[in-house]
Amino acid sequence: MMRNVWKSGLRRSAWIGLLMVLCVGVARAQLYVEIAGAGSSQYPIAIANFQGESQIPQDITAIVRADLVHSGRFSNVDVAGAVVPDSPAPDLGAWKSRGAAAFVGGTVTRNGDRYEIRFRLYDTAKGESLGGLALTRGEGQLRLAAHEIADYIYQKLIGDRGVFATRLSYVSKVGRRYQLQISDSDGANPQVALTSNEPIISPAWSPDGTKVAYVSFESRKPVVYVHDLISGRRAVISNQKGNNSAPAWSPDGRRVAVALSRDGNTQIYQVNADGSGLRRLTRSSAIDTEPSFSPDGRSIYFTSDRGGAPQIYRMPTEGEDAGSAQRVTFKGGYNTSPRVSPDGKLLAYISRVGGAFKLYVQDLSNGDVTGLTDTSYDESPSFAANGKFILYATRVGGRSVLAAVSTDGRTRQILSLQAGTVREPAWGPFMQ
């Protein structure tokens, strides 16, 4: 969080393995989702209970329905408990008459310790199939399968890739105990990656989603670690003199930008992913911090007070102009925490407005700025992998919560713990 700063390639199979072995313990504190706003135009869809689903330990269709509703783009048509297999084709006219523009039927079959899940998506207006999938998963992977089904439906009907099968990282605090946690995108299935009596901040996902870089104070000073979520092993990648903070991965996963005070005032540096090859990028008499790579890896956006107050700047990472910065934000007197959308078109950041800190997005092509929230303590923005939502931390009703808002500001979600606080969110990449 910037306000505190001023004060002080694997395959899908490996991903599935990650979900099984990442944790050193299962978190007891799960995030709960509350819809605070929905899109103005919603797609009515009927998702029947899958044949054979009642015999398995996970309610797949309930997860699919919840995923789609949470996106703000869908409304569920009541199926009144109907059980419909993936074949033969259902009576689409009957579902159309109930108000459904799309319909999903499916079948779950158990084969030993594995489950085959087949489903088919239909357009009720055209009376035709839009395709489907056949997934084979173990018992511990059924939630993932449900998210994958929701992703398929979302992409077929909306046209954008879904992010339901992605993961979140965040830091919870209960009493004096901090935990770095990894959960499903809906906040369910939380796993503990690290527990500490000292603060953990600034988690950042590697592009392939198998590692998280973060800052830990367990050595009584900020040190940057990289945590391998598959093996559970971690390594120090920056423990220079002074503060080591704000890790950010390059898009190719080979480099990590960090903010270091080793030479006096905090500046932006770059190291290889194993901690070797330290290289200084900025050379100013100001505080330069919070680096964030552009999607093509050619630029870094960062926060600097070189103009007298914190603003966001951009600099090339290579070539003769490397380290030469240009100011990006001009609206507002205090702007921090830059994050660039996956398509490189939007910049999310936190702006101080009066005494409040609010999430804004700036169109990088024309400089237009839009406020997205009505809360006053926003921090740590992070784009979803499809660029359609931004996850951030804030306070609602006196509670520290996570929130997600669509980039048009129409759809909002609140994710909170029943006890303790939750902060420092980061939205993980697409599964590869």
Curated annotation (Swiss-Prot):
Signal sequence region: 1-29
Pfam families, alphabetized: PD40 (PF07676), TolB_N (PF04052)
Keyword Signal: yes
Function, in words: Part of the Tol-Pal system, which plays a role in outer membrane invagination during cell division and is important for maintaining outer membrane integrity.
Similarity field: Belongs to the TolB family.
Complex and partners: The Tol-Pal system is composed of five core proteins: the inner membrane proteins TolA, TolQ and TolR, the periplasmic protein TolB and the outer membrane protein Pal. They form a network linking the inner and outer membranes and the peptidoglycan layer.
Name of the protein in its database record: Tol-Pal system protein TolB
